[in-house]
Amino acid sequence: MLLNPPVLEKAMYSAKLVITSAAFGLWAFSAGAVSIDPTAAMAGIGRTATVCGVVASADYMVGSRANPTFLTVVNPDQPDAKRALTAVIYGHDRAKFGTPETTLQGQHLCVTGYISYFRGRPEMMLTTPRQLSYIAQPSVAQLR
């Protein structure tokens, strides 16, 4: 029996969440996480890593399936979005982060987690603020 494309896409999406969540739960905060530059994230696929850079864009996709917020983390010296890591905060975890599309935009930070591959790009799911560490602390005004 063949599944129609929307059903197959939903099944693949669900499987990705389960696999990535399992990987995150096992390894995301391991002492063995390597530290890499966003431009090297593609080579880090399948590994747990800490990726440090600047959030070049932060977009909340309200109304889309899972209501994700996409953070594009780039190397500040080479801000090429094609060589960036996409960090994803899904809607069910969003409240833990406040309004990440405003508080994280332009921030110099590190994200730690399992790097997966999605639509030709490296991606990391963020489920808790413990996966974030600021290189330069945000001001009180930015946190409001």
Residue ranges of each PLM-predicted region?
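Bacterial N-terminal signal peptides that target proteins for export
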Residues: 5-19
